[in-house]
Each structure stands twice: as structure tokens, then as C-alpha cells.
């Protein structure tokens, strides 16, 4: 799938392991991995950060292979899932930082244009999350209250 606001094709990607089973050298049980996920979520880490830590520190290539569930599903079942989806959260955070930059640098036309692109991405993603019922139907992005969402 190509990029939304540029001509890039986006063909670079990582290759998933062919085997859908845990490797033979992997010794942790699925309960241990779930406990680790819950522990890191309570520290305030996002699902992708938890996945990176599990991969680098504990040798878990994919949590779904070991536990049978994705990290976000495990967090939802334990009531630790973030209220705003992670990709939407980081887009809002980026828009807040660009808006803060524009307060100091009012003549920065390029940043003004990029802010419009970021906010259009936010609106499109929010519309998708409302249709799949991840966000409530009356949820709306407003630039005035956005800094409170990411703080």
C-alpha cells in the first residue's frame, strides 16, 4: 500500500517467520509471557514498545505465536488497553508538537501545510476507528483539546 501524502510506494517490509510455532529453544511458557506483557503495560508502555522489549530482552519473536493472542488482545482482556489506539495517539502527538512549533514560528508555511496533512490523516483514521467501534461514535478530534489527550 502506498503512502497517503507522497509518491512513495512503501515496499520495504520485514519478513515474518514461516513457522507459526514457538521455536524449540524457547523455554518461557505462555503464562510467563502474558505476565511480562501485563507488567510492562502497568509501567505505561505501549503495545509496540512491549513487543520490542519482548523481542530484544526475552527472545519472543512474536507474542501471538507463544500466547495465541496478540499483545493488544491480552491488554484488552486484562483491562489495560489504551483508550485511544496507538497509531492515532502518535498522530495526535505529532500534530500537537507541530502546532506548538507554529505558535513560535508563524511564518513557517511548510509546517502549516504539513499540519493540514497530519490532521487529515487523523480525521481519516478516526473515521475508520468510529466505524469499527474502537472509538465511540461521537468522538471527534479538536485541535484545542488535543494537547490534553496526549499529555
From Swiss-Prot:
Component of the ribosome, a large ribonucleoprotein complex responsible for the synthesis of proteins in the cell. The small ribosomal subunit (SSU) binds messenger RNAs (mRNAs) and translates the encoded message by selecting cognate aminoacyl-transfer RNA (tRNA) molecules. The large subunit (LSU) contains the ribosomal catalytic site termed the peptidyl transferase center (PTC), which catalyzes the formation of peptide bonds, thereby polymerizing the amino acids delivered by tRNAs into a polypeptide chain. Keywords: Cytoplasm, Ribonucleoprotein, Ribosomal protein. Belongs to the universal ribosomal protein uS15 family. It comes from Candida albicans (strain SC5314 / ATCC MYA-2876) (Yeast). This is Small ribosomal subunit protein uS15. Transmembrane segments: none annotated. GO terms for biological process: translation. It is found in: Cytoplasm. It holds the Pfam family Ribosomal_S13_N. One of its GO terms (cellular component) is nucleolus. NCBIfam families: PRK08561.1. Component of the small ribosomal subunit. Mature ribosomes consist of a small (40S) and a large (60S) subunit. The 40S subunit contains about 32 different proteins and 1 molecule of RNA (18S). The 60S subunit contains 45 different proteins and 3 molecules of RNA (25S, 5.8S and 5S). It comes from the Eukaryota. GO terms for molecular function: small ribosomal subunit rRNA binding; structural constituent of ribosome. The keyword Cytoplasm applies.
